[in-house]
A protein has these predicted regions:
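N-terminal mitochondrial targeting presequence
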Residues: 1-13
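Catalytic cores of secreted/periplasmic or lumenal enzymes
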Residues: 13-268
Length: 268
């Protein structure tokens, strides 16, 4: 009897999941994304997915991608996230009625951030996403976001289950937004090309003027600049700087992995 009850519950859960991920649900979600996510908000929307997944701990088997970012907005590292949360909330509200009403907030963050990549010229990722996540009901543990040095950043990403290649693949997303890696609304491999050029480094750019170096000093985060002088990181920076398609493919794989990390699913 117990086994039959468990089987019945699992079948019901799977049926509920099937209703979440249908062609009709995906079409309704797509319409809401197009309506509510503007290109000018794409960098802020994409930033959400990194902050939401950046709390993952493989050792503790907690944190990760679960929409807990909604409850973490007062943290110092979350400054400015409300700008991205607005469009995502609008997409979520627009899908509360109709075939996409079963999507969780985490599902919508994953889809909206993927759409932000596509909207700015990057790879199409949304169709590769799995839906049916369960939302967190409170914040994840604090003090898990990466620090500034290359070594500490790689260590933080290892704690989240990522290799060095994967660690270097992800921050290429800084190519959009205000970090000054190329055009702010163009998703390309300018991040890696800029790291190799090191416009902030007078030794690398001996003919640069003081004004040039001053402008260069405002490019990227300290952690980005530290990658540019880390031998292990440079192996992958060089690869992505010359092969944008390779980076697009591997970023897509990493995005899917990141949005499934430590997620709780409705069919489990």
């Amino acid at each position: 009897l117990f086994c039959r009850l468990r089987s019945s519950r699992r079948a019901a859960a799977l049926t509920a999941l099937d209703k979440v991920d249908t062609p009709e649900a995906r079409a309704a979600l797509r319409a809401a994304l197009v309506q509510n996510v503007a290109k000018t908000k794409a960098p802020a929307v994409l930033r959400l997915v990194f902050h939401d997944s950046g709390t993952r701990s493989v050792a503790d088997r907690d944190g990760g991608f679960n929409a807990s970012v909604r409850f973490e907005l007062s943290r110092p590292e979350s400054f400015g996230l409300k700008r991205g949360l607005g469009p995502v909330t609008a997409v979520f509200e627009a899908t509360r009625d109709g075939p996409a009403s079963g999507l969780s907030f985490a599902d919508v963050i994953a889809a909206a951030s993927a759409y932000a990549v596509e909207l700015t010229g990057g790879p199409e990722i949304t169709s590769k996403l799995r839906f049916g996540r369960v939302d967190a009901q409170g914040p994840d543990p604090e003090n898990r976001m990466p620090a500034e040095s290359a070594a500490s950043t790689k260590s933080a990403f290892r704690a989240m289950g990522y290799t060095t290649r994967e660690t270097i693949c992800l921050p290429g997303a800084h190519t959009i937004g205000g970090k000054r890696f190329g055009e702010p609304y163009v998703f390309d491999n300018a991040y890696y090309r800029t790291l190799l050029a090191r416009p902030w480094d007078s030794a690398k750019n001996s003919s640069a003027t003081t004004d040039d170096l001053e402008m260069g000093s405002h490019v990227g985060l300290t952690s980005d600049k530290n990658f540019a002088t880390d031998d292990e990181s440079l192996e992958f920076i060089n690869l992505y700087a010359v092969d944008q398609n390779l980076w697009f493919r591997q970023f897509t794989e990493m995005y899917v992995k990141m949005t499934e990390s430590e997620a709780t699913w409705r069919d489990t």
